[in-house]
Swiss-Prot record:
Protein name in UniProt: Cell division protein SepF
A Pfam family it matches: SepF
InterPro entries in alphabetical order: Cell_div_SepF, Cell_div_SepF/SepF-rel, SepF-like_sf
Lineage of origin: Bacteria, Bacillati, Actinomycetota, Actinomycetes, Mycobacteriales
Classification via HAMAP family: SepF
Assembly and interaction partners: Homodimer. Interacts with FtsZ.
Compartmental location: Cytoplasm
Gene Ontology CC terms, in alphabetical order: cytoplasm
Protein family: Belongs to the SepF family.
Region (Disordered): 22-72, 79-98
A GO biological process held by the record: FtsZ-dependent cytokinesis
Presence of keyword Nucleotide-binding: no
Domain of life: Bacteria
Record key words, sorted: Cell cycle, Cell division, Cytoplasm, Septation
C-alpha cells in the first residue's frame, strides 16, 4: 500500500475496506483471529517492556564497584581491649594481705606461746550466755590464762561476764585486760603478760583460731 493511497484513504478519497485490507496485510505482527499467545510470552511482555534490557545496559556501573559477594564485610572484626579490661583492679590480691586482728602470724605465735612461756597454756572460751561464767572461773582458778571472746553474746550478758571476770581477777590477784572489741584476757597471778604480748595477741588474732 503506497503512501499516497494511505493519505487518500485517510481523507475518504479511497474505499476504507481497501485501506484496512492493505493495512492488515502489511502488519505481520498481528496474529490471526482466534489465535492466543502462550501465557509465558504475554507475561514477559507485561513484566519487561521492549527495550528495557537495552536501556538498563546504558547505565555504567558505579566507580569502585566490585562484582560478586563481598566476604570482607562479614568477616569477624578483631576488637581491641575494652575500657574496663584496661582498668587496673582497685584492690590487690587478697592472699597475704590480711592485717591486724584478722592476721595469723605462725612465727609470732610460736615465739609467744612456745614451751616454757607464761602463755603456753592459754585457752580461748566463747560463752554463749552468762551461764558459762562458771567454766571461765574454774579455768582461771587452775592457773590457766583465759581469753574470753564475747563477740557472739548480746551486750547485756557480755557486760555481766566482764563484771564477773574483773571481780575474779581482783580476788585471785590476777589481771584483766582488753585485747580487742569484746575480747578480754584473764591472766593468773603467776603469769605476767606485758602490753607488747597483748598487742601481738590482738594483731595475730590468735583467739580466732583456737
Amino acid at each position: 500500500m503506497s503512501t499516497l493511497h494511505k493519505v487518500k484513504a485517510y481523507f475518504g478519497m479511497a474505499p476504507m475496506d481497501d485501506y484496512e485490507d492493505d493495512y492488515y496485510e502489511d502488519d505481520d505482527r498481528v496474529p490471526a483471529r482466534g489465535y492466543r499467545r502462550p501465557r509465558e510470552d504475554r507475561f514477559e511482555d507485561e513484566a519487561y517492556p521492549r527495550g528495557y534490557d537495552d536501556r538498563a545496559r546504558e547505565y555504567d556501573e558505579p566507580a569502585g564497584y566490585r562484582g560478586g559477594f563481598d566476604d570482607a564485610r562479614f568477616e569477624p572484626r578483631l576488637r581491641g581491649p575494652r575500657e574496663f579490661d584496661r582498668t587496673p583492679p582497685r584492690f590487690g590480691g587478697l592472699r597475704g594481705s590480711t592485717r591486724g586482728a584478722l592476721a595469723m602470724d605462725p612465727r609470732g605465735m610460736a615465739e609467744l606461746f612456745e614451751a616454757g612461756s607464761p602463755l603456753a597454756k592459754i585457752t580461748t572460751l566463747r560463752p554463749k550466755d552468762y551461764s558459762e561464767a562458771r567454766t571461765i572461773g574454774e579455768r582461771f582458778r587452775d592457773g590457766t590464762p583465759v581469753i574470753m571472746d564475747l563477740v557472739s553474746m548480746d551486750n547485756a550478758d557480755a557486760k555481766r561476764l566482764v563484771d564477773f571476770a574483773a571481780g575474779l581477777a581482783f580476788a585471785l590477784r590476777g589481771s584483766f585486760d582488753k585485747v580487742a572489741t569484746k575480747v578480754f584476757l584473764l591472766s593468773p597471778a603467776d603469769v605476767d603478760v606485758t602490753a607488747e604480748q597483748r598487742r601481738r595477741i590482738a594483731e595475730a588474732g590468735f583467739y580466732s583460731y583456737q
